Amino acid sequence: MVGGQVSEHLEKTDTNMQRLLPGVIAMAAIVVASNILVQFLILDGLLTWGAFTYPFAFLVTDLMNRAYGPQSARKVVFAGFIVGVICSLIGSQIMMQGDGYEYAAVALRIAVASGIAFLVAQLVDVAIFDRMRSGAWWRAPLASTIIGSALDTTLFFTIAFAQSVPFFSENANMEISWAWDAMPLLTFGPDAPLWVSLAIADWAVKMAIALIALVPFRVLSEKIQNVVT
């Protein structure tokens, strides 16, 4: 009797791992790619190529949520968070060459902001999606991604670029001082701190991808459901 229960438990565990593995791999790939592509600037520095890969993390979360429920989606989120922390630790040890000085590829405040924003925004996405899952097929992924993306942008830019955050050292605050340089808003408007333009551009890309991602969500969610059933 006990042996049968153990065997059944192991079988369920193996099945759950098989279900989660594609989501974990996809999330890890997105996080790693985004951490690499964030080093490459475009549009006069308003965006990086990472801005176009990172939002697809919400697609992965929503697909896992639709197919296997919020508990499985949260496990994928935590896996992505761990991968992100590892990437940040590696990035903090890579020194880049500036004009007569060296600096870490990933500043401390940016690393902390990235991790917190990812974890909170993704978990909020999971909760909103689950609450709205019984409506029209597009409502849950669209609403959860829009709200999660807005929260992600708000948290990241607040923690990363607020002029001074008490629990960070003076050196950590100085590392992001460039974000307060006055620049034309979005390169053509009135002068504003650079981080404001970065935040607006980042948010705009996320909103666009939230709409675009409805297409692969529809297609992939149906395929996954066919496999599950």
Label each PLM-derived region with a short phrase.
Residues 2, 9, 139, 157, ...:
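Alpha-helical transmembrane segments and their cytosolic interface
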Residues 2-78:
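Hydrophobic transmembrane alpha-helices
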Residues 17-20, 24-32, 37-40, 96-142, ...:
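Short helix-perturbing small/polar motifs within transmembrane alpha-helices
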Residues 27, 31, 35-36, 58, ...:
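Transmembrane alpha-helical segments of multi-pass membrane transport proteins and ion-pumping complexes
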Residues 39-43, 70, 96-100, 130, ...:
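Transmembrane helix-loop junctions in multipass membrane proteins, especially transporters and channels
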Residues 71-79, 139-146:
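Membrane-interface alpha-helices at helix entry/exit sites of multi-pass transporters
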Residues 80-88:
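Small-polar-interrupted transmembrane alpha-helices in polytopic inner-membrane proteins
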Residues 81, 115, 119, 142-150, ...:
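Transmembrane helix-bundle signature of multi-pass membrane transporters/permeases
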